[in-house]
Amino acid sequence: MKEILNRLINNQVLTREEAKQVLTGLASGEFNNSQVASFLTVYLMRAITVQELEGFRDAMLELCNPVDLQGYDAIDVCGTGGDGKNTFNISTISSFIVAGASVNVAKHGNYGVSSVSGSSNVLESLGVKFSGDAEQMKRSLDASHICFMHAPLFHPAMKNVGPIRRELGIKTFFNMLGPMVNPAFPPNQLVGVFSLELARLYGYLYQNTSKNFAIVHALDGYDEISLTGDFKLISNATETLVSPEVLGFRKLGQAELHGGETVEDATKIFEVVLSNQGSEAQNSVVLSNAGLAISTVKQIEVTEGIAEARESLESGRAMESFKNFLKTNS
């Protein structure tokens, strides 16, 4: 590890195979905590390369417990996190709106590391019991059109790294990796990323797969469609800038997306918004993200996807999906 760290600090890069080997070593406990922490922080000081990201992804997927969800044509709706914006759980709420529109969601999530509350924090506080059983994921999808894969249960080899990430409390390349290592390998993906550079890296990697994808990055730094300004959209077919007005929404202020200071705050917002009792700003932002997810799977216009998302939320079908999900996973 000393040699690897010296190379990285001197702005040298790892090959894809070297990156895979290092991450495999991290997983096996080959390195001490100081070495692991140093390795994680190097990538805050210099950009990660495509080859390094591919190697880290290869190791994570090789070490994970896979879930076979063939036939469900599911989508994962998630962000990398690490944007420092402390928004409410937009992608989690959006996922249930997508499920309420009868589009299958295979969501992969975790506890918050650099934020107050990740998707796992909110769902756990609502009574969800996490499972690492692949058959349980299928039962959940059949009952509610959504399943939730709590990352530590499907990536057990990463148990050595988790405590160090929590102690650091800052974004690391594991934030970049999270959306790429969904153990169900869903054929569709909506992913929000915290930088334009990472959006382009994701675009390059996904263009070399069979995945049907949409990658978003708000130009003011959000890892999702925030409606606080224009956002970059990269998909199989296009790379473009999109304004809130094009989607039929007004430009929002950052304060309107605040997620509170505790898990309890985040949970309350989740319940209020999913009950169609959220503010106009909260509703707009979840509908835009859910609408893009629906349109990605169905290959329709984003505005059509937003209309389906609105119907899901306003009819109560999104909340019904959550209630069925909770019943199956508690």
Model-derived regions, located:
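Acidic, glycine/proline-rich low-complexity segments that act as flexible tails and inter-domain linkers
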Residues: 1-87, 101, 105, 252-257, ...
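Glycine-rich anion-binding loops and their surrounding alpha/beta cores
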Residues: 7, 59-65, 87, 102, ...
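A generic alpha-helix surface/boundary motif
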Residues: 17, 92, 117, 121, ...
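A glycine-rich phosphate/pyrophosphate-binding beta-strand-loop-alpha-helix module
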Residues: 40, 88-144
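Conserved catalytic-core motifs characterized by acidic clusters
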Residues: 75, 110-111, 182
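Acidic, glycine-rich active-site loops and adjacent beta-strand->loop/helix elements
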Residues: 79-84, 109-115, 154, 219-220
